[in-house]
Amino acid sequence: MTAESPGRAPVRADTPAVVYRAQEQDKPWGHEQIFAAMDGRYVGKVIHVTAGNSLSLQYHEHKEETISLISGEADIQYGPVDGDLTTRRFGPGDTIHLPPRVVHRVTAITDIVFAEASTAPPGWREDVVRLEDAYGRTGTSAP
């Protein structure tokens, strides 16, 4: 038995479930847990940022992301590549969708945890253009 999805290969209904541990990666601002990395389909992360730290001011050429704050308070900056950025204070439950080429940065006011769901186009792991980075990674796709 198979289930068909438009634009996708058939998925077998009798495919076994897979149990595994999320991949943990230390970052200069905290750490992330990648709990789903289905290349060509989607990525799911839980990201922990310690108070006072910021992720890079960045954008993606192809990848799109949705970020939802689970706990804490954060400032989210976002806007066009060639325009002014908007800053918005986020609390638990606040969510933002970021299409490709939207500049964005998350700054933790308190310790924060947020969920990130994104597309996974070919090369998604390197699809980051860092405009500013407090940890010396500007202009790189280093983790």
Which residues does each PLM region occupy?
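Glycine- and acidic-residue-biased ligand/ion/polar-headgroup-sensing regions
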Residues: 62-79
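A short hydrophobic beta-strand segment most commonly corresponding to one strand
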Residues: 66, 110-130
